[in-house]
């Protein structure tokens, strides 16, 4: 475990890059770290090249980013954890777990292409998982000679954002070239600094739910020989300290109690983890097979596992990439809660024979495994790897 203390003097914000495959998300992430390391050198600001962000071996073989890369950097006023969210449609599931961790995001659109299918999909996902603030980076402007074409692409992006209830007319659009900035072109480096100034000012410092009871959705689990089991994820709300008693809730039949013996972030030890932090939690008396992704670590008795609830859902239209046909009573899709999919059956309200793509409806859901849910928990409805709806738990039934 890490020895160095983590510096809390600057406010911490989680952001990420989203957008269509090959539009330059990873190159922009590399450019931000590299330009900040040149302009604002510090122990945090270390340049990361494309290959190191695109690190997992299977990613390079296909030239597409699969896993979610985490990098950190700081501006004069803030510390950032940056997620490079995968752009390819096959990896939307990973995108959902990544986007759920963002206070705001940079939507990368290649000026040479304009908005593409995954641009739309990622805007929709951002809306669904509660990413409220988007900034647009129009990339590859060095490859477009026609000023009018750039204006058209910008208008198209703004219209698309408005369609999904983002303030398309007002949100910032920055035009630049991530590759040119990475290569050290001063003009394009300046634009990266302008982008970061915009991120500093436009994405509000998140309201942290530190006063609420602890809830940490488990993303990953590993064991450290001689120390015990570590669960990692982003603290949704509350705080966690060494010696805290916690419960591991969901999926398994029984809720398990445990004690926290260590908290760390970016390989540095913390006195406490706060809402919004990406942390690893060392747990005493928990075997590696007793905790898994999809469960939550919570303050004892603060949240319970449930299989039945009422939900308000919106079913995506065909144009939004949803189903082409209606569904009927006892439809069995996957319900995506926080970090995992669980199959469930849908019971429609009395008198409703079917639900059409584009409809809003109140449904009763019964899951095959209990999940830690409460009123206000959000979820996506998915089938065959694609999102077909989104919803929010309105009432717990059992």
UniProtKB/Swiss-Prot annotation:
Asked if the record carries the keyword Metal-binding, the reply is: yes
In terms of InterPro entries, this protein maps to: EF-Tu_GTP-bd, EF-Tu_GTPase, EFTu-like_2, EFTU_2, G_TR_CS, P-loop_NTPase, Small_GTP-bd, T_Tr_GTP-bd_dom
Task: Tell whether Cytoplasm is among the UniProt keywords.
Answer: yes
Q: Where is this region: G5?
A: 177-179
Which residue ranges does the record annotate as region G1? Answer: 19-26
This molecule's function is given as: GTP hydrolase that promotes the GTP-dependent binding of aminoacyl-tRNA to the A-site of ribosomes during protein biosynthesis.
Disulfide bridges in this chain? none
State its location(s).
Cytoplasm
Per UniProt, the keywords (alphabetical) are: Cytoplasm, Elongation factor, GTP-binding, Hydrolase, Magnesium, Metal-binding, Nucleotide-binding, Protein biosynthesis
Region annotation (G4) ranges: 139-142
The name under which this protein is listed is Elongation factor Tu
Return any one Pfam family short name.
GTP_EFTU_D2
Q: Which residues form the tr-type G domain?
A: 10-207
Give the matching PROSITE patterns.
G_TR_1, G_TR_2
Q: Where is this region: G3?
A: 84-87
Q: Please indicate which superkingdom the organism of origin belongs to.
A: Bacteria
Q: To which species is this protein native? A: Streptococcus pyogenes serotype M1
Q: Which portions of the sequence form the region G2? A: 63-67
Positions binding GTP in this chain are 19-26, 84-88, 139-142
Q: Which NCBIfam families match?
A: EF-Tu (TIGR00485), PRK00049.1 (NF000766), PRK12735.1 (NF009372), PRK12736.1 (NF009373), small_GTP (TIGR00231)
Q: Gene3D superfamilies attached here?
A: P-loop containing nucleotide triphosphate hydrolases (3.40.50.300), Translation factors (2.40.30.10)
Listed under subunit, the entry gives: Monomer.
Q: Which GO terms describe its cellular component?
A: cytosol
